[in-house]
């Protein structure tokens, strides 16, 4: 994950001071891309410990179309708590858009099922896309989608994915986002009898918060270690039938965790 550290250093060296929605302040660059060959290991940051339990449960929650934090809380995952209302609701965020995008005529589109069918029946299509950025429902969401749009691509029997992330918290959020979408590629590839290819991450407003600077400098002193390996223990009948226990990470030997405040 050397390229992740290189991005942190680039933001420190070249970033522009900017105000932001949270009032915290950032150093920001615009437009950056990283490519991870998933054949070479699972891209889980090793220069600090990442909470893999949260990453897996959040993705399973998205795939169920869920937008209430009850499932996450039941599994000791608190990453969405700050944005939930008193009943645990978040509005029509990621899961709703992925699984039940509303149409003007009252129908709902299951984008995940749609792209699975495309991958199986028309893998050369250039339209294998999922979008969470529904402009008609942004004002109903507790938090507008940061990782907004992703596209799948099949070549030589390998499945690749590119994500566009319009806003990226480099220190806290990005390690989660990379691992989450890498996990999704592995799951989709297994369901479609494909090998994994590349995960390509593309960032828009790519920033470090002003209260993450000390933590960032500490992380930059650490040497990346070998990437772990993802093992999926079984192949469920559906992309929606995976369970937390189906996943195992082998060989993850990270440096200690680094705590930092979340900008809300």
From Swiss-Prot:
Which reactions is this enzyme annotated as catalysing? dUMP + (6R)-5,10-methylene-5,6,7,8-tetrahydrofolate = 7,8-dihydrofolate + dTMP
Recorded GO cellular component terms are: cytosol
Question: What Enzyme Commission number(s) apply to this enzyme?
Answer: 2.1.1.45
GO BP annotation list: dTMP biosynthetic process; dTTP biosynthetic process; methylation
Q: In which pathway does it act?
A: Pyrimidine metabolism; dTTP biosynthesis
Q: Which CDD domains match?
A: TS_Pyrimidine_HMase
**Top enzyme class of this protein?**
transferase
Q: Which residues bind dUMP?
A: 21, 126-127, 166-169, 177, 207-209
Checking PROSITE patterns in the record gives: THYMIDYLATE_SYNTHASE
The family note in this entry says: Belongs to the thymidylate synthase family. Bacterial-type ThyA subfamily.
- What NCBIfam families does UniProt report for this protein, alphabetically? PRK01827.1-3, PRK01827.1-5, thym_sym
Q: How does it assemble?
A: Homodimer.
State what this protein does. Answer: Catalyzes the reductive methylation of 2'-deoxyuridine-5'-monophosphate (dUMP) to 2'-deoxythymidine-5'-monophosphate (dTMP) while utilizing 5,10-methylenetetrahydrofolate (mTHF) as the methyl donor and reductant in the reaction, yielding dihydrofolate (DHF) as a by-product. This enzymatic reaction provides an intracellular de novo source of dTMP, an essential precursor for DNA biosynthesis.
State the protein's name.
Thymidylate synthase
Q: Which organism is it from?
A: Enterobacter sp. (strain 638)
Name of encoding gene: thyA
């Amino acid at each position: 994950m050397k390229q992740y550290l290189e991005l942190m250093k680039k933001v420190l060296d070249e970033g522009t001071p900017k105000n932001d929605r949270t009032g915290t302040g950032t150093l920001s660059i615009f437009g950056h891309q990283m490519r991870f060959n998933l054949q070479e290991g699972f891209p889980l940051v090793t220069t600090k410990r990442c909470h893999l339990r949260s990453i897996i449960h959040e993705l399973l929650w998205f795939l169920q179309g869920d937008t209430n934090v009850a499932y996450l809380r039941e599994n000791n995952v608190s990453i969405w708590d700050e944005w939930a209302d008193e009943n645990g609701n978040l509005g029509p965020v990621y899961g709703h858009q992925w699984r039940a995008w509303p149409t003007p005529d009252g129908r709902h589109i299951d984008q995940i099922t749609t792209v699975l069918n495309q991958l199986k029946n028309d893998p050369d299509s250039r339209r294998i896309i999922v979008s969470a950025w529904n402009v008609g429902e942004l004002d109903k969401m507790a938090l507008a989608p940061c990782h907004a749009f992703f596209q799948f691509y099949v070549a030589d029997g390998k499945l690749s994915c590119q994500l566009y992330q319009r806003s990226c918290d480099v220190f806290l959020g990005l390690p989660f986002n990379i691992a989450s979408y890498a996990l999704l590629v592995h799951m989709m590839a297994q369901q479609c009898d494909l090998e994994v290819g590349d995960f390509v991450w593309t960032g828009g407003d790519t920033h470090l918060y002003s209260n993450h600077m000390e933590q960032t400098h500490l992380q930059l002193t650490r040497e990346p270690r070998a990437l772990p390996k993802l093992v999926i223990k079984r192949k469920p009948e559906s992309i929606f039938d995976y369970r937390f226990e189906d996943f195992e990470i082998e060989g993850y030997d990270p440096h200690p965790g680094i705590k930092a405040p979340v900008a809300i």
